Each structure stands twice: as C-alpha cells, then as structure tokens.
C-alpha cells in the first residue's frame, strides 16, 4: 500500500510538469477510490478497524461582497466524517465532495500504522553525543481530534489536518521523569507498519532544563507563592504548568506538563527540603562530569554529523494554556564555547542541604537568584500536520535514536 501511494505521488509530480493539474483528474479519482475500497472497505483487510474516516470538502462563501454575485471567493470547508464500515449511510465511491486522496491518507495514518513515543532525560557530552540517563516508551494512537489535557472530561474537538498523539494518563506513565540543571528532556515519536517491516521517525524534539524552569517561573505567579507563604501552608497552589516544545523547523509540537518536585513544602517555591531516601532527588545521579555548553551555529548534529537542521527561532512566546519554550534545537545541535552553568550534581547537593523553615527563610529563598530545583516533565501529547507525517513515512524514513 505504501509503495503504491509513493508511486502515485511520483506520477502526479511528473504529470504536473507535463500538462498541468487538470489533465489526469479522472485517473486520479479512479486510483484513490480503488485504494480506499481495496484497503479499507474490504472485510478481509488484516487488522482492519471498524471505523471509516472520510474527508469532505465543500465550497463555502464569505458574507462580504466582492464578486459579481455579491459573494467572496470560494474557500474549501473541510469536515471529517466517521462511519462504521457496515453502515448503510456510507458516502458513495463517486461522491465528488469527498477528497479521496486525503481520505486514504487519513485512514492509513489512523489504522494501518503503530506509534511509539519515547521520552528521555539526557545530557550532552563535549563531543556532542547525547547520553541517555533515563527513558520511558509508550504506545500512542493517532487521532484527528483533541481535548485539553489540563481539564479532564471536556469534549473532544476535530483537529484535522493536525493529528494528535495523546497520553491521557501522562502523570502515571512518566511519573519518574525528573529533570535538573544541565539536563534536557528529549522526545521521539516513531511510526511503523503492522508487520514492523519499517520504522520512521516522525517527530523529534528537546527542551533544556533552563528553558523549562524559565517558563515555569514566569507562569507561576508571585501572588500565588506569597499567598502560600503568608498563609503558613493553608493556601494550596496547583503548580502544574503546560509548556510547548516545538519540532525542528516548526514541524508540529509536543506539550509537557511541568511541575516542581516536592521538597516537603507545597508552595511553588517551597524551602523545606526532604532528605528522605524516598525523595525523587535520590532516584538517580547523572553520570556526566562536564556540563553542556551553548549550541554551535555552524554544524547541527544529533549523534550523526550528517543530519542537517535549520537553525530555529529562539524566542519565547506567551501562550494562554501552553507556553512555547523552544524550537528543539538542543536535540540536533552540538555545543561550543564556555557556558556559565553549574555541574548538574550540584543541584542534588544543594537540594539536600536544607535551609530555614521560617517565613524569613522562605522570603530569602524566594528572592535568591540561584534557586534551581528539580522539575517533573510529563509528556502529554505530540501533534503533527498530516502531510508532514506522510512525507516522513513515504520519503524520509529517518531511523529512530532513543528507541535503540
């Protein structure tokens, strides 16, 4: 099936060069309706889902008058319709409002492929290689709809052409994912066919602790922190914030649920450190001795010097529910120069040393410049445009790194 789609896309490019778009329109409709019928409607199709997805395109007109008939230029209105395979209301194979090519591609992505997402806590060595200290893989499922991750039970909304890979139980799945100073969180989403004959990376991204902490500090209001301290702990603040991690070259994004690791105080900037062996601060010790350094602008690299990535934007933009913290440059680029960053092991020693428990001590630590602490980093979802997934599956097929 994948080979047939790739060959048809190649023929389409050739036809455009020879005689334009309209020359073989009927042939293309025949091909895509045949593909839809053969691979999704036939009952013998292996491991076939019971649902069928149709992409319907209608011409909608704007209310402003600009044309001869008082209507603005037509714009396509896209709807995703879902039917059971044995439904008597299935659109006919000759329905002109159905985009048969996109319907085939959508059903391919939703039904014919498996997806595995891996989240890892890593550091970068002097040579540019990534060292994985902890990772967790989880199977996810593609969906043309989405729902807010910060409020359970809300109704899903159609997100097509953006495809979402959501982890509803993200707090349980990534419960032990903590990141500290000098470390970064890396995310990789891999697609494979049902027989596992091929694998291809469709998303890679990373975000440094420093970027996560900066966003976290900005989002947690000073008023909430002070209210917690002045009320001697009676005011409970929910300190989970949602941070977006952009993909390379702006290809999709992932969302992280970020919260502070408990240190014995429920405030967002609590000062009561817990030195119990059960504390998450004792869960692991990083194995590197040299701190990472700022990225080099001349040659991107992620394990392999042959990888090429556009240098992304480095701006941080405010979001209402999600905050975009980076463009995932750390996952693909080498480091260079001398950074004024402390060794990651210092975080553990500082966190376990303990400070005063009084209100005065809280006030001093609130205003302390060097206030690093461990953060939970829970992956909530990855989202990508459908056409970018298709390109990676049919043409690029980049080999996975975190899963190896």
From Swiss-Prot:
Basic and acidic residues bias spans: 320-336
Pfam families for this protein: DUF2045
Alphabetic keyword roster: Phosphoprotein
Region (Disordered): 261-307, 320-340
Keyword Phosphoprotein: yes
Residues with the Phosphothreonine modification: 290, 293
Modified residues (Phosphoserine): 267, 276, 279, 304, 306, 324, 358, 362
InterPro entries: DUF2045
Transmembrane segments: none
Protein name: Uncharacterized protein KIAA0930
Gene name of the encoded protein: KIAA0930
């Amino acid at each position: 099936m994948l080979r047939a789609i790739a060959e048809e896309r190649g023929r389409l490019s050739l036809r455009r060069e020879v005689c334009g778009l309209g020359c073989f329109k009927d042939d293309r409709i025949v091909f895509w309706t045949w593909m839809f019928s053969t691979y999704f409607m036939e009952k013998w199709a292996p491991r076939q889902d019971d649902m069928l997805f149709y992409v319907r395109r209608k011409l909608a007109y704007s209310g402003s008058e600009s044309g001869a008939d008082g209507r603005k230029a037509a714009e396509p209105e896209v709807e995703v319709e879902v039917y059971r395979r044995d439904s008597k209301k299935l659109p006919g194979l000759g329905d002109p409002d159905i985009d048969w090519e996109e319907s085939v591609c959508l059903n391919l992505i939703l039904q014919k492929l498996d997806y595995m997402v891996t989240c890892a806590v890593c550091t970068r060595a002097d040579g540019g290689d990534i060292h994985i200290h902890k990772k967790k893989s989880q199977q996810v499922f593609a969906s043309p709809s989405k729902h807010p991750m910060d409020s359970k039970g809300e109704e899903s909304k159609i997100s097509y052409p953006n495809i979402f890979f959501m982890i509803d139980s993200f707090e349980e799945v990534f419960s032990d994912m903590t990141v500290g100073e000098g470390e970064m969180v890396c995310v990789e989403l891999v697609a494979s066919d049902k027989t596992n004959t091929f694998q291809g990376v469709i998303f890679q991204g990373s975000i440094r602790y420093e970027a996560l902490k900066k966003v976290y500090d900005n989002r947690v209001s000073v008023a909430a922190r002070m209210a917690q301290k002045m009320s001697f702990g009676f005011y409970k603040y929910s300190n989970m914030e949602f941070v977006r991690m952009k993909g390379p070259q702006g290809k999709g994004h992932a969302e992280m649920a970020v919260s502070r690791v408990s240190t014995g105080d429920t405030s967002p900037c609590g000062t009561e450190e817990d030195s119990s062996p059960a504390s998450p601060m004792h869960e692991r010790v990083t194995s590197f001795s040299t701190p990472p350094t700022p990225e080099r602008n001349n040659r991107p690299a992620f394990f392999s010097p042959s990888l090429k990535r556009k240098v992304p934007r480095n701006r941080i933009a405010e979001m209402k529910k999600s905050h975009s913290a980076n463009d995932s440059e750390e996952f693909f680029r080498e480091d260079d120069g001398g950074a004024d960053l402390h060794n990651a092991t210092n975080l553990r020693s500082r966190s376990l040393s303990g400070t005063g428990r009084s209100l005065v001590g809280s006030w001093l630590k609130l205003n302390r410049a060097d206030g690093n602490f461990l953060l939970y980093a829970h992956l909530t979802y990855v989202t990508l445009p459908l056409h970018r997934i298709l390109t990676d599956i049919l043409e690029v097929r980049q080999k996975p790194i975190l899963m190896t």
